[in-house]
Curated annotation (Swiss-Prot):
Annotated keywords: Cytoplasm, Magnesium, Metal-binding, Nucleotidyltransferase, RNA-binding, Transferase
Domain of life (superkingdom): Bacteria
Name of this protein: Polyribonucleotide nucleotidyltransferase
Record InterPro entries: ExoRNase_PH_dom1, ExoRNase_PH_dom2, ExoRNase_PH_dom2_sf, KH_dom, KH_dom_type_1, KH_dom_type_1_sf, NA-bd_OB-fold, PNPase
Protein family according to the UniProt entry: Belongs to the polyribonucleotide nucleotidyltransferase family.
Amino acid sequence: MLKPIIHKFKYGKHNIILETGVIARQATASVLASMDDTTVLITIVSDNTTIPGQKFFPLVVNYQERTYAAGRIPGGFFRREGRPSENEILISRLIDRPIRPLFPKDFLYEVQIIATVISVNPQINPDIISIIGSSAALCLSGLPFLGPIGAARIGFLNNKYILNPSIEKIKKSSLDLVVSGTKNTIFMVEAEASILSEDNILNAILFGHESQQSLIDNIYLFSDKANKIPNIYKNIYKPDKQIFNLISKKIKKDINKAYYILKKKERLKKLNDIKQKVTSELLNNDSQLTSSKIEESIYFLERNIVRKRILKGKLRIDGRINNEVRKIDVRTGILPRVHGSALFTRGETQALVSATLGTSRDAQNLDDLLGDRTDNFLFHYNFPPYSVGEIGIVGSPKRREIGHGKLAKRSFLAVMPNIEDFPYTIRLVSEITESNGSSSMASVCGASLALMDAGVPIKSAIAGIAMGLIKENDSYIILSDILGDEDYLGDMDFKVSGSRLGITALQMDIKVSGITSDIIRSALYQAKSARLKILDIMENTLQIPRSDISKFAPRIYTIKINPEKIKDVIGKGGSIIRMLTEETGTVIEIKDDGIVKISAINGEKAKYAIKRIQEITEDIQIGKIYSGKVTRILDFGAFVSIGFGKEGLIHISQISNKRIDKVINHLKINQIIFVKVLEVDRQGRIRLSMKNI
């Protein structure tokens, strides 16, 4: 018999239901989590063996949406769900990020979390309940998870913070912030903002963490009610102090010297030489040792050396003080045929960013679970292996690249022009050509310059900075513009982007507990200081958007026609619009409300297309003289075309002031003549005359 264990509670204004014991019972743990009819099935399966030589925690999170959840059938030929969408990948990362740091560093068993959306309320985004359900399932799994964690989405509307706002409210909100953490510590923040102050952001984070306290209490109650599995992984490897001390004695001085080498490439070569030499020596002397044990001890040695140096107030790895930003080089317009381009170099991190302007036909059509939509602003981030001096597979973007592209895109949403004012689809591409930390924020800086170089009228320049943290007990140091090694050996990766007036996006990932509001506040204000310095340097090169778009970009013109005339412009089977596009070399798009967009690389061609459309759609004016072509000759007169789809009759009596016997003696087929409109009757028939012209 199926014996469900159900726990219901209120979370703000929402009803939460956590259930286990009925579905997916073969999994290590499973939870059916619901928030006001948005339901997600969370399953966790863990392996009971490790892969020899495994060096990292192989956690895989797969978030997947089923279209039946929204009462829909998938599009496409196969009519079934395919590879993960960008949104599914982003939410997978959102679930992963607060969970991963809560497993012991030496826990190396493979774990897979699958979150499947099986019912959706169109006003409730499934991401928050997916994090909640994953936290609850992990608490039942018997894995050494140091949770539970909570999750909250915070909006800011009418000067008030809103807990888990609906889809409708979040569209009106000036903030979309997700915060996740344990009872005492925040571990993850993701936010998009409409240029809000540091205090607004900090208060939102604290409000979100405070709000999820009752949620965490209820997950504890649920796990107690469900008789969670005891922790079955008792024999987890712990670092051997004897090995650590031996390695420390042999190479501590050499490692310390290596971390005074300022250039990354030289430093890494020296460190690798030291590591290979000591590893080879120890393995030859002791057959019981493994390379993974040696590597872990070396990691802790490196970590201790770098962290102690910084905490003592000494210079950082590359010789900077804590709040110093690396040397910046800015160049714009470096790609001659590209609509806008910039090369942004910060130390050993470099982004080559291009901006491309397209028409509405280039916009991306998105088939989301919460409804179809069109996106006319795209940001793609590429991280090739050569950027870190490695050989690797080049192919479709990885999760990290998609995540960094999304963060960079969110940095600009508050300053992009309205589609009505600037009717272009905009695509930004950031090629990371060198990387030593903070490449996503270099992409933001480069993108701001590329947009302005392309003549996109953004409201203000945007810059980004990545902050780090070194924390031991109550002592801590916040680092500006972190290197890759400082990210790897440190306790926080805190990316902040914005304008001079405020923050537009941020992403925070914390690896340790004990992060206080004072630490977050200090990081935010230190980031602001760095951001303003970077903006000063950027604005020395390009202060405002260029006054005109590139000569290689399409010119888009917009006109309004009577919606009843749309059929005249399109023609039977699209014949007229096809002829117009071929004749003028333009792209013509017509909306149901009569808005017509004409785009062409050559502005004169676009203007000619406008003239032709106006000729087609303008009403025939009585008494006006038109140039026309004779199309048919009959005994009683001739038909003359005076525009697309507009044909009038000249009666034989209106061809000449004198009496004539035969029309054919005065007019020929395809002859161009001038005619005056005498009348347009109720049926739209046009009567013409050649007299007195």
